[in-house]
Amino acid sequence: MAGYEYVSPEQLAGFDKHKYSAVDTNPLSLYVMHPFWNTIVKVFPTWLAPNLITFSGFLLVVFNFLLMAYFDPDFYASAPGHKHVPDWVWIVVGILNFVAYTLDGVDGKQARRTNSSTPLGELFDHGLDNWSYVYFVVTVYSIFGRGSTGVSVFVLYLLLWVVLFSFILSHWEKYNTGILFLPWGYDISQVTISFVYIVTAVVGVEAWYEPFLFNFLYRDLFTAMIIGCALCVTLPMSLLNFFRSYKNNTLKLNSVYEAMVPLFSPCLLFILSTAWILWSPSDILELHPRVFYFMVGTAFANSTCQLIVCQMSSTRCPTLNWLLVPLFLVVLVVNLGVASYVESILLYTLTTAFTLAHIHYGVRVVKQLSSHFQIYPFSLRKPNSDULGMEEKNIGL
């Protein structure tokens, strides 16, 4: 498996023809964030590889997730009567979240600034963005947590799916239309949650207990914003863009079945994971919510990454992600009835396997594309120039 190649020769040929095509109509992004990023990118040295900026931002997101997992492992820290997360943690998480968001915004500008834009950079950026969504949602959950003043773990599970499907819709659009319509929700949510983290440090989590309007709690606002953004902005815009492409005869696929293929694996993942929750003899989501969310988010990220590879290379998306096979078997075993500790072991084993499989997929795809385009993923130096330097050294030049 160490040398397994996930990207086919047909896909590599498709990457050679790929040209970045994206549309960003978000006013916040256009009139506030892009001018800010244009200023920030000038701080970075021109020898700094864009992918290194992207990866650094992703690591900050992971750090926030782990930091909050330490102080709030089971999402009870914000509930009344429990030890709350220290104020300094909220400040750190808020600052790092905004820094990560900024790095995600300047990586493409650094690529254009250094004339180092490649399909690998686009795939690397969107692939890590895709995995980041589960980290974002789960970390934000700690603001409200569970309990009488919070949101139930099952409601958060459903909200996670709303966010995940909102992300994949934009890449499903590009798979069918050839144009990536950047979602409005991402920029708005990143700025908002960074601000809310800092506010939480100032006013304390107790401030979120109180109703802010007509007994409407902040937790309800949190839920309404996620669902409202998905149903009133993301989904309508995606369908509108798809319909426009259909009317203009610019759809890449003429079959409804083929157009929907990229959504099969995510939908099946939702069905299987939800079935596990509903059939669980030990109420697995209540026992290990953080691990369950991460398992779902990682499996989803793997399916979405495969879609991104296919839409960038103009190849057919696989109908089924093989990670769903062991998940199906686990759900089948759980339905037959197992002891609580056995179910927990199955969850942790499956989560570990999914994580290792996804990391292996990412590393191998990056290595394949780096070799294909003759570049280093984290350096602007060219492999050919290194070889030339060694040859000159050997002949005494």
From Swiss-Prot:
Chief location category: endoplasmic reticulum
Modified sites of kind N-acetylalanine: 2
Pathway(s) it belongs to: Phospholipid metabolism; phosphatidylethanolamine biosynthesis; phosphatidylethanolamine from ethanolamine: step 3/3
Keywords: Acetylation, Endoplasmic reticulum, Lipid biosynthesis, Lipid metabolism, Magnesium, Manganese, Membrane, Metal-binding, Phospholipid biosynthesis, Phospholipid metabolism, Selenocysteine, Transferase, Transmembrane, Transmembrane helix
Pfam families in the cross-refs: CDP-OH_P_transf
Required cofactor(s): Mg(2+); Mn(2+)
Tree of life domain: Eukaryota
Chain segments annotated as transmembrane: 47-69, 84-103, 123-145, 150-172, 179-201, 221-243, 256-278, 291-310, 317-339, 344-366
PROSITE patterns: CDP_ALCOHOL_P_TRANSF
Catalytic activity: CDP-ethanolamine + a 1,2-diacyl-sn-glycerol = a 1,2-diacyl-sn-glycero-3-phosphoethanolamine + CMP + H(+); 1-O-alkyl-2-acyl-sn-glycerol + CDP-ethanolamine = a 1-O-alkyl-2-acyl-sn-glycero-3-phosphoethanolamine + CMP + H(+)
Compartments reported by the entry: Endoplasmic reticulum membrane
Record-level Gene Ontology MF annotations: ethanolaminephosphotransferase activity; metal ion binding
InterPro entries for the chain: CDP-OH_P_trans, CDP-OH_PTrfase_TM_dom, CDP_ALCOHOL_P_TRANSF_CS, CHOPT
UniProt EC number: 2.7.8.1
Similarity remark: Belongs to the CDP-alcohol phosphatidyltransferase class-I family.
Summary of the function given for this chain in its UniProt record: Ethanolaminephosphotransferase that catalyzes the transfer of phosphoethanolamine (PE) from CDP-ethanolamine to lipid acceptors, the final step in the synthesis of PE via the 'Kennedy' pathway. PE is the second most abundant phospholipid of membranes in mammals and is involved in various membrane-related cellular processes. The enzyme is critical for the synthesis of several PE species and also catalyzes the synthesis of plasmanyl-PE, a lipid required for proper myelination and neurodevelopment, from 1-alkyl-2-acylglycerol.
Name of protein: Ethanolaminephosphotransferase 1
Lineage of the species this protein comes from: Eukaryota, Metazoa, Chordata, Craniata, Vertebrata
